[in-house]
């Protein structure tokens, strides 16, 4: 198994990637047989400027990996594609990439593997697609250039170079396909980004429209409220005069009713007071009975109120007890007749009463009218009380006088009726009770 290694010069600090990949930077190219373990010592010798311990650890890891690769390629029967499930088997060594590419059929190279060297700026740049199989080393001992320079090795090198050239042609075509696929993926990503940008734009537009709708709703609510307030104010302005007119009309009606009531009361008072003001000499003939109206009740002269007598035990009065002289009480009918004659008819009363016109009465202030009404009511109440007081002593006198003037006479008649059938006589008695009032 042959390992092809391309040696580069040591990379300096300020050296760029393009400077390193130039042809001038290539130092030497050698091929090694991986079957011999001693060859690996020349390949994996390297150093680290910062820490030597880390280089030893990483060198050990790299040696193990290379040994595993050598074992897998020595026996062709044991080689399987399932061992390399991923597209690339990549490992890092001294901050550079090492890898074996599966897509270019590395397994079918007749147990020969070619590892072309290419230095990369790891991890900013990926490994190169120009060469399918590569093995990167940072620095290798220059003494290895004098190793294995016999003719057999030269023939193997020629064969491997020819085969590698043939493979490079197929690799270039496959690389083009890969690049095209990558470009399509990039275009798809761009399209997806464009589509996502369009989606975000549409979402932003929708959000803006929603915000404008909400603002318009708020403005509409405010305008509706303002219009509603204006409508209510206008309605109130229209309704208030009507209500005022109705109130004024009601007040006028109430005033008219009060004035009518006052006029009626004044007329009644004047009718009651007119016979007192008439002269005693003037006598007016009463109207005929057809036109005669019932006179209004007049107040009777006030009598001293009888003191309430205490109940005394009633004793049998002697029959011949002297009675106090009582004045003969005049008959009520006789008292009423001359008064009825003196009352003039209703028409004459209205003529004699000098009433002020209604205009003058209406001009009087309402306070005087109210005072007059109160006085009239008080007078009427006093008159009613006087009448009740007068009626009470009269009833008492009548109750006292009735038992003294009443006399009862009983007459009995005995009638004997003969029964013709039985020849018997049955007496029947009839009694009569008569009462006479002595005045």
UniProtKB/Swiss-Prot annotation:
Transmembrane segments: none annotated. Residues 268-439 are annotated as: Disordered. Disulfide bonds: none annotated. InterPro entries: MBLAC1. Residues 268-284, 350-439 have a biased composition (Low complexity). It comes from the Eukaryota. Residues 285-328 have a biased composition (Pro residues). This is Putative uncharacterized protein DDB_G0294196. The lineage of its organism: Eukaryota, Amoebozoa, Evosea, Eumycetozoa, Dictyostelia.
């Amino acid at each position: 198994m042959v390992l092809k290694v391309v040696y580069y010069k040591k990379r300096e600090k300020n050296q760029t990637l393009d400077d390193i990949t130039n042809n001038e930077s290539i130092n030497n190219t050698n091929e090694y047989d991986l079957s011999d373990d001693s060859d690996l010592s020349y390949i994996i010798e390297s150093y680290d400027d910062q820490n030597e311990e880390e280089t030893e650890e990483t060198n050990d890891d790299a040696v193990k990996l290379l040994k595993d690769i050598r074992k897998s390629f020595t026996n062709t029967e044991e080689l399987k594609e399932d061992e390399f499930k991923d597209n690339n088997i990549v490992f890092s060594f001294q901050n550079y990439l090492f890898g074996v590419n599966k897509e270019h059929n590395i397994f079918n190279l007749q147990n020969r593997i070619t590892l072309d060297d290419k230095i990369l700026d790891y991890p900013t740049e990926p490994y190169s697609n120009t060469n399918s199989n590569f093995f990167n080393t940072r620095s290798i001992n220059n003494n290895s250039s004098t190793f294995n320079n016999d003719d057999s090795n030269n023939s193997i090198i020629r064969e491997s170079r020819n085969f590698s050239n043939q493979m490079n042609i197929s690799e270039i075509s496959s690389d083009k396909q890969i690049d095209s696929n990558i470009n399509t993926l990039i275009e798809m990503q761009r399209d997806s980004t464009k589509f996502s940008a369009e989606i975000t734009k549409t979402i932003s537009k929708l959000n803006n429209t929603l915000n404008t709708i909400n603002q318009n709703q708020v403005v509409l609510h405010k305008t509706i409220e303002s219009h509603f307030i204006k409508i209510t104010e206008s309605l109130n302005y229209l309704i208030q005069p009507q209500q005022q007119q109705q109130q004024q009309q009601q007040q006028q009606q109430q005033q008219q009713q009060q004035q009518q009531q006052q006029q009626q009361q004044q007329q009644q008072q004047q009718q009651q007071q007119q016979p007192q003001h008439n002269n005693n000499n003037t006598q007016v003939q009463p109207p005929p009975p057809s036109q005669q109206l019932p006179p209004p009740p007049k107040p009777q002269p006030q009598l001293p109120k009888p003191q309430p007598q205490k109940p005394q035990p009633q004793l049998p009065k002697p029959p011949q007890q002297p009675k106090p002289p009582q004045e003969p009480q005049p008959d009520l009918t006789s008292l009423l007749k001359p008064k009825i004659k003196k009352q003039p008819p209703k028409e004459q009363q209205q003529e004699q009463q000098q009433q002020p016109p209604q205009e003058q009465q209406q001009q009087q202030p309402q306070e005087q009218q109210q005072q007059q009404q109160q006085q009239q009511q008080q007078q009427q109440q006093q008159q009613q009380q006087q009448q009740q007081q007068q009626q009470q002593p009269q009833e008492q006198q009548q109750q006292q006088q009735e038992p003294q003037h009443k006399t009862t006479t009983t007459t009995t008649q005995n009638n004997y009726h003969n029964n013709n059938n039985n020849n018997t006589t049955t007496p029947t008695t009839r009694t009569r009770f008569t009462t006479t009032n002595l005045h």
